[in-house]
Amino acid sequence: MKLYKKRGIIYIHSTFNNTISTLTDVFGNTIVWYSAGILGYKGPKKSTSLASQLISEKITISILKNNIKVVDIYIKGLGLGKETTLRIINNSGIFIRSITDITPIPHNGCRKKKKRRV
């Protein structure tokens, strides 16, 4: 039987209002997910870097509980939480195989609204 290290994928969705982190296996099945609202933060406190720090600590605890050794990280969004989350996961001793930014960038998508004339 082939021995392999258990792998996982972390999706970090960071907006200006919230940070959502999802831990999945290689096939895309969700193992655990956390957001600032789950941890008890409401309103403007959800967008702080402290909330994203607690989210990433919870994710690293669940990675260690599930015996995951290798992690791929996908980051989406422009919020404050992505750098904090990356730093904490990197310092936890988990091997990060790749970090990919999947933030959608429009290539001149929808037409802008007309300018307001006063």
From Swiss-Prot:
Any one GO MF annotation of this record: rRNA binding
Any single GO CC term annotated in Swiss-Prot or TrEMBL for this entry: ribosome
Keywords in alphabetical order: Ribonucleoprotein, Ribosomal protein, RNA-binding, rRNA-binding
UniProt-listed Pfam families: Ribosomal_S11 (PF00411)
Coiled coil: none
InterPro entries, alphabetized: Ribosomal_uS11, Ribosomal_uS11_CS, Ribosomal_uS11_sf
Protein family according to the UniProt entry: Belongs to the universal ribosomal protein uS11 family.
Entry function: Located on the platform of the 30S subunit, it bridges several disparate RNA helices of the 16S rRNA. Forms part of the Shine-Dalgarno cleft in the 70S ribosome.
Subunit record text: Part of the 30S ribosomal subunit. Interacts with proteins S7 and S18. Binds to IF-3.
Name recorded for this polypeptide: Small ribosomal subunit protein uS11
Source species of the chain: Carsonella ruddii (strain PV)
Originating gene: rpsK
